[in-house]
Amino acid sequence: MTRAGLSPLAWLADIEQRRRAEGLRRELRVRPPVAAELDLASNDYLGLSQHPDVLDGGVEALRTWGGGAGGSRLVTGNTELHEAFEHQLASFLGAESALVFSSGYTANLGALVALSGPGSLIVSDALSHASLVDACRLSRARVVVSPHRDVDAVDAALAARTEERAVVVTESVFSADGDLAPLRDLHAVCRRHGALLLVDEAHGLGVRGTRGQGLLHEVGLAGAPDIVMTTTLSKALGSQGGAVLGPEAVRAHLIDTARSFIFDTGLAPAAVGAASAALRVLDAEPQRARAVLDRAAELATIAGVTEAPVSAVVSVILGDPEIAVGAAAACLDRGVRVGCFRPPTVPAGTSRLRLAARASLTDDEMALARQVLTDVLATARA
């Protein structure tokens, strides 16, 4: 059969139609600068993205250093601002060093690929974020996917390995369900088998611990020489970017070998300045971390979720993707924006509303959330 005259992209129409039929079509929605609706969808957990100090920090960096870094940090993109922020972040999180990337995604790619490679083993939690999954695929290491939060399975995989090096990968706070990794137990297993533990604190920073220093700090593992932390600047810190924290030797290795660092333009100065200012606010106002969990507990009660949340995330399982999409749309029609997670982001049959608590939610906003969520969820569950 000749293929002459056929569009090489004709197959996209069939794929799009199939996704639409399965309720998995995604659309971009434009957000105004000041949203008219109540936001229970964003990851701005501490409410800092619009904080005056954070805005001033971004503007000052913009005026001082310009709109962009101008190149890779190995060429022209490394400024005093970047390095000062890395010291600030490492000090706050109890790490020896930090290296800033252009996003949390590239931080995970850079760290895991550079710290594994052919002839090594990666043991990754089944619910690890897509950036960690992609890093596993790019690493050329042997990858074992362990059942969610199953320490015994991790132990068995490490005990059976023939590779000299091994990395165990987990999120501290899992992004879809908001549950916590058993970090102390995982670390004990890693120590017993001589494995590195890599922990993504994207959803732990700013929320867990009495001062918002993350789950590693909370459980007494911050700064451990056999742990590498990754995190993002785009959630609790209300900015953009990512970072890898750990021993100084890790930082030096990443500068030499992490392709998502070497071949990427440095993080924009405005994002660095905003993140630095946000970190200062969090350091001065640690009560914001507790406020997030308090508001999450209220949202869980409103949504009929019986298990008390341990993070900013309240996951409301509805099952069918069309029901979840319809519920999210109904909430938005009544002035409340919520997250909607469907496959492949979550497993089939677990489509859900994802509610994200913020420290800055007011009593009036919580009253609106109660009114809307109670009505919409009653209909969705009927």
Curated annotation (Swiss-Prot):
Report keywords, A-Z: Acyltransferase, Biotin biosynthesis, Pyridoxal phosphate, Transferase
Required cofactor names: pyridoxal 5'-phosphate
The answer on whether this UniProt entry bears the keyword Protein biosynthesis reads: no
The species is Mycolicibacterium smegmatis (strain ATCC 700084 / mc(2)155)
Q: In which pathway does it act?
A: Cofactor biosynthesis; biotin biosynthesis
The UniProt entry's sequence similarity note says: Belongs to the class-II pyridoxal-phosphate-dependent aminotransferase family. BioF subfamily.
| Single GO MF annotation | pyridoxal phosphate binding
Q: Which domain of life is it from?
A: Bacteria
Q: Which residues carry this modification: N6-(pyridoxal phosphate)lysine?
A: K235
One GO BP on record is: biotin biosynthetic process
Task: Provide the protein name.
Answer: 8-amino-7-oxononanoate synthase
Residues annotated as binding substrate: R26, H129, T345
Q: Which residues bind pyridoxal 5'-phosphate?
A: G104, Y105, S175, D200, E201, A202, H203, T232, L233, S234, K235
Its biological function?
Answer: Catalyzes the decarboxylative condensation of pimeloyl-[acyl-carrier protein] and L-alanine to produce 8-amino-7-oxononanoate (AON), [acyl-carrier protein], and carbon dioxide.
Q: Which PANTHER family match?
A: 8-AMINO-7-OXONONANOATE SYNTHASE, CLASS II AMINOTRANSFERASE/8-AMINO-7-OXONONANOATE SYNTHASE
